[in-house]
């Protein structure tokens, strides 16, 4: 940083929430890093978020409590926020400013990078085609995640999204390249007990060695919450495109991120958009989600799994609605399955992976994968219709085939969707379980599966020549 770029002012005209207004600044840049020196000599940092008519608004990371409009100095540093990043960060826990939260030493090696990153040139993007095994049957079998994809999880209040996120972080891998796989885990505005759960889970399972955690708590200033996914993705980009690693970025909870955006927008007295959220929330979310992907000529990749809580389980709420426009599908957690004691309570009919078709099949997962998933979807959808009919006319009035569909639905939920927190299923195991639950139905009902796959994988024929 050149000292020639540093400008110092002392005329703070307003302090409101996490913002301060500085008069007389004519050349401030958006997202420029600012240093505030208090009368007692202590310092805080912030970013320029707006500048108009000679007044510049600065968002203070540590909050504005204790800042005095008289006696405080505001320095504009002529650069964006940079964080030192390195491979040393794997196995460690940091705040979004890159400062350790695990009582370990600061990062010594590595390099400083602007947390806003550089957008991937669309012409250099490579289409996702490699399967990532999460060990979760409802994802791997029916809504497969591909390397370079962005696939969010839509949860509801009280549903086990945290447990599922931790399990995926522990189990996910690109088969054959396990040693070259890393997880960047951003916990945004979580409660202290949730942050402690993630830390203990990763440490006790040994997954911490390949995980870099970035954490902000619920009582942290909104400006820090907004920085969390950006810093995490800056490390992900470094590991993927400089160190040729396959990186899975898990961002939880993006609802807290959007609430922080709304809080800052209200502090700036901006005209609210839909649901009271700022009108630029779609663009802001896109700057985060679009940092996932593969680049032609680079061995590494960034795969994203943003996780968000739907207020009132409403998928039409602005946060899940806008997220769905940007990402490539969604995994939806269902309260009725959760109330049945099924974990993970993934509603496969509401879930979708738009890129799945390009990452499954012979040479990628197994030759029967596509046919089997189509049949499981169709059979479960029909079973749900039959459940509704049975609730009206009673099971005794159903045909024999319809009653078998009811048995199939129960087995599908209890044996295919449900699995243990520490149960890591290979894709072969997942597909075999799918065949086992389908074997409840008459063979004549398996109209979406080619006969050669039935002869090869159906339990009635498996192992026979």
Curated annotation (Swiss-Prot):
PROSITE patterns according to UniProt: ATPASE_ALPHA_BETA
Which GO biological process annotations does it have? proton motive force-driven plasma membrane ATP synthesis
Please give the Pfam families that the UniProt record associates with this protein. ATP-synt_ab, ATP-synt_ab_N, ATP-synt_VA_C
Q: Does the keyword Thylakoid apply?
A: no
Q: Where in the cell is it found?
A: Cell membrane
Q: What are the cysteine partners in each disulfide bond?
A: none
SUPFAM superfamilies the record matches? C-terminal domain of alpha and beta subunits of F1 ATP synthase, P-loop containing nucleoside triphosphate hydrolases
Note the topology in the membrane.
Peripheral membrane protein
Q: What does this protein do?
A: Component of the A-type ATP synthase that produces ATP from ADP in the presence of a proton gradient across the membrane. The B chain is a regulatory subunit.
Q: What family does this belong to?
A: Belongs to the ATPase alpha/beta chains family.
Can you state the subunit structure given in the record? Has multiple subunits with at least A(3), B(3), C, D, E, F, H, I and proteolipid K(x).
Query: Any idea what this protein is called?
Result: A-type ATP synthase subunit B
Q: Which organism is it from?
A: Sulfurisphaera tokodaii (strain DSM 16993 / JCM 10545 / NBRC 100140 / 7)
| Gene this chain is encoded by | atpB
